[in-house]
Amino acid sequence: MASLALRGSSENPAPTKDTTTNPRGIPYAPFVDRVEDYVTSTTDVESTLKSFSEMISKYQFMESNTQRRSAGLKDKIPEIQKTLAMVRFLAGREEDDEPLETHFELNDTLYAKALVPTTKEVYLWLGANVMLAYPVDEAEELLVGKLGAAKTSLENCDEDLDFLREQITTLEVATARVYNWDVGQRRKEREGKGGKS
């Protein structure tokens, strides 16, 4: 894929060695300005079209994975924000000696009443069935870091999705140009043979 991505046009100059990929390593699709740069005869058309089709499939696979990752982050960010808000609430109650009365969810429609004493540590689920105790201030610091990383990752996913859609469109246009060039060449060949008879 990278060998085809090194070509360019006056509108889209050939990427330099440093810009053949986006910041996360996804390669640029080749921009076909002149079909003759890719295809020299009608015998090359099939292999070129197959190559473009394979690249489109790869970009679509990357797009699908990025969409899944983005959806996961969109679910995860509100959970982190909710947990962070609770940790900050508990941090604000450190000086209060009275226990907090609360209701917590046992099931979708079943809640239990509890008295939560003032605490200096919280337990956080880290994933993969791992829970660790943290002092409240360290838990807040950890959650702020995780929230920032998740938001950055979501922004990167959104950028990558836009980039991938652009590359898929570029390849679809390239495929159409090569196909149309082939049709034109075959028509010229038929007209040339028909004129000689």
Swiss-Prot record:
Residues 9-23 have a biased composition (Polar residues). Gene3D superfamilies: 1.10.287.370. One of its GO terms (cellular component) is cytoplasm. The keyword Chaperone applies. CDD domains: Prefoldin_3 (cd23156). SUPFAM superfamilies: Prefoldin (SSF46579). Keywords: Chaperone. GO terms for biological process: microtubule-based process; protein folding; tubulin complex assembly. GO terms for molecular function: tubulin binding. Induction: Expression is positively regulated by the cluster-specific transcription factor TSF1. Expression is induced by the presence of the cluster-specific polyketide synthase PKS1. Expression is up-regulated in the presence of large amounts of glucose, during nitrogen starvation or at alkaline pH, conditions highly conducive to elsinochrome accumulation. Residues 1-26 are annotated as: Disordered. InterPro entries: PFD3, Prefoldin, Prefoldin_subunit_alpha. Belongs to the prefoldin subunit alpha family. PANTHER family: PREFOLDIN SUBUNIT 3 (PTHR12409:SF0). Prefoldin subunit; part of the gene cluster that mediates the biosynthesis of elsinochromes, pigments consisting of at least four interconvertible tautomers (A, B, C and D) that have a core phenolic quinone to which various side chains are attached and which play an important role in fungal pathogenesis. The non-reducing polyketide synthase PKS1 was proposed to iteratively catalyze decarboxylation between acetyl-CoA and malonyl-CoA subunits for polyketide chain elongation. Heterohexamer of two PFD-alpha type and four PFD-beta type subunits. This is Prefoldin subunit 3. It comes from Elsinoe fawcettii.
